[in-house]
């Protein structure tokens, strides 16, 4: 079967890989001159199923108000009055209660845990290298309240069967030696030993080459103008003067998926702007061993081979990708505070990207009302974490095979009034069926 995939970020490329492995004739189209040139290019580098959780959480509305007056706030909102922004924010607010949070988190952890297994299998099968580490992640607390509140996260981890360890400030250096010098600034941490790290851009570029060798065709520097519809299916993709036809079509367009699908399929995907710094390492012993997440500022600091990636924050500002100096100051402040001698900040590369976020935090993977149109989008800040699982899941669905995890509540159908999952996965049973 001929399959066209729109988008060559990590989600689009993993989709292409798994579909090609099923024997399909796959073509990937992207407006950029190569894979992973937008959102996948500069993310924080964490593969963190244990921290998979929606931004829509109890207490976030009040925190958002407080953050409006803080210089280094993790979330910023700039209202533009657009119906897309206002509708998305309203939908997000409706998901900020405990019951919605638990349902959404269970979906996200289910897919993220499965995705990590898929990545491990892919790595074993191909030997792909992407400066990956399997050193776990460490969430850092700066206040006693944060340390005490970890009990709530631990309860969720227990239900999900995710291994963890709660560390005192003095114990942090046992997993991140460079933190010994700043332990007095911290109250403790939550470590998830099974989480991983890696350069998402490098992974995507190398997997794209492997996919090309497996027969996938990549068409770069080509804008996608419109999806053409005949009856109840897609008839082709309009790219300038050309119409590209296939038997099935996959939209992996990230934050731009909503506009492309307008009038065809309604999806609540909105751009959540994030930032990162990439810093050359000058003293390996003073740099992170793996990755940490500063709970106060929601900023991750990750070790690659000879670089430190510092990423995080969220801005609800539409499709604005301009670099904000104040955000760079925040990133620099956090890395200087925790790893002051690890790298040369004066040589850092500053980046911003638009994460495709749904109001419930869960990506949209699966079928649509148009019988040959499929979606793989809306992964928010967890595209790297969920990419392999989403790609394999989509390949199973297109292949007509039962997926390895419960998947009906990951599709766009969940936004339909009266939707009820065919299979309810309780929080304590969200691991892959293997």
Curated annotation (Swiss-Prot):
Transmembrane segments: none
Keywords, sorted A to Z: FAD, Flavoprotein, Oxidoreductase
Annotated InterPro entries: DadA, FAD-dep_OxRdtase, FAD/NAD-bd_sf
Short name of one Pfam family: DAO
Pathway per the UniProt entry: Amino-acid degradation; D-alanine degradation; NH(3) and pyruvate from D-alanine: step 1/1
UniProt KW Transmembrane keyword: no
Molecular-function GO term, any one: D-amino-acid dehydrogenase activity
Catalyzed chemical reaction(s): a D-alpha-amino acid + A + H2O = a 2-oxocarboxylate + AH2 + NH4(+)
UniProt keyword Oxidoreductase present: yes
Annotated signal peptide: none
Cofactor (UniProt): FAD
EC number(s) given by UniProt: 1.4.99.-
Positions bound to FAD: 3-17
A cellular component term, taken from the record's GO annotations: cytoplasm
A biological process from GO: D-alanine catabolic process
Family the UniProt entry places it in: Belongs to the DadA oxidoreductase family.
PANTHER family per the UniProt record, alphabetical: D-AMINO ACID DEHYDROGENASE, SARCOSINE DEHYDROGENASE-RELATED
Function of the molecule: Oxidative deamination of D-amino acids.
Protein's name according to its UniProt entry: D-amino acid dehydrogenase
Species assigned in the record: Yersinia pseudotuberculosis serotype O:1b (strain IP 31758)
Lineage: Bacteria, Pseudomonadati, Pseudomonadota, Gammaproteobacteria, Enterobacterales
